[in-house]
């Protein structure tokens, strides 16, 4: 649990250096550190920043600066409390030294991007309230929250670097934008010196992509309240480099991401990740796809359509070629995209991630891991040969000193004859052994897949379970990505029952093949893995114990309480009043009279992805039935358990104890 995880990378324009962002637990401070590291050929890897709150590094186009976000306070601003510290954009020299704030005002940055010539940075931030609105709220509404009205859209600002740097050193007072009449676009509030308003949106701006000549800015929107209620909140817009009225380019049911311009400024490339909707027709949770759009006409073309796996990140090489990460089965590899074609490039056996190209060189940064090898950052000098890697980092070396579990893929037939694949992770030295106690560990998503990649944290502790003597079965049930659209769409509208049959068929096959001891079976998962765990303990008494986290036990209240309302409705064929039968028949709660399995529950106290109330409801059901159980509430934690590392540590510690306790009975 004491691992350093790589959260981001940025490659210098000439590929001579790289910045790497990491997250690591700070056990004494009860939080996670976020730091930046610099790699150069001469000096190797060394710390670049030490504040513990630095993320999302981006090199300037000329290589002179690195911009990043941080909630550190500018010098002299000691009055900022821990609860109101905004994320600002900061600048630091590649050679290190003191970081300088791009602005001092309390603007909480959502995203940022460098201007192509490096003279400015585009920033999106929530529009400040006008003084008039602040007074009106205080006088008329007191402490009453108006549910929808409380949200404000974003401003897209252009902040010139030269005056910002001068201001960071001199620390003058903020610039006051003159008050505007009611209804005017510009707020009466403090904006940074040298900032110009490019656009004002009624929604949040999630990505910014300036055209190569700087004359146009593409940006991607998302809901201001961060709840997925309507795919129309996710669209691509175009605005002039000096401002103007934004033009909407896309009108579809997909959630676009990863905007990138072609070098000639003709195309805007983008991705739609797995389970993020569809460009073509009605909303469907298909696999990840790649597209390019004519910036003038808005016409969209799909790329790499011959690939039947799931695309993720991509990068554009200086010569215009596109490379993409594609998940196929249990591994992610690199593919060269040429129209409809997707050609797999030579690769190491394992999982590639975090693809990023240099602006002025052919080199790539990638991350790579296997089940037994922690993820590291590598430099690829020839993009056509990603199997030839130069290792830049060596985080988490302790794993090389320990006995490692072995693994193998495993395939079986479901109840309807569908072939399903998963992964078996054996205790160290036990590969191929039979009659082992088995823990079925179900991945979340459901649009995801388990395979040959490293995991050692509160969410993915499969190798830890294997090291504690469990054969770990990780099924890629229907709804998983990397196995074709038909396989992924097979989950709808039977959200838990169909994948549940896939998983139970896998357990039966492993017992029949002699791998698993039928008297020593356990099950668990988090998020959608929790959904499935909750469901399967109503369908069978095979399992001696269950460990579940952040899994819905019913769907009607969760539809109203979570932040993925639209997707919930798609999976179940409509909103609760449109398909009430499925909302009941696919919910574990309505079959809880069948539950006999001792169950360990975990829930973040502030989770909105799967409402905390789902855990409370399930606990009450188990209590009323007299089923042995325990319920751990992790205060302040959302779905990702990213506030306090002790919460994740205690979660896994207690889950392992629960499995051991009931395996021995």
Where are these regions (language model features)?
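The serine-hydrolase catalytic nucleophile loop
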Residues: 444-461, 613-614
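Hydrophobic beta-strand positions that form the internal "hydrophobic ladder"
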Residues: 18, 66, 121, 217, ...
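Active-site-proximal cap/loop segments of hydrolase catalytic domains
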Residues: 441, 461-464, 474-665
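Short beta-strand element of the alpha/beta-hydrolase
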Residues: 434-444
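Residue-level detector of Asp-centered blade-edge/turn motifs that repeat once per structural unit
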Residues: 13-14, 61-62, 116-117, 212-213, ...
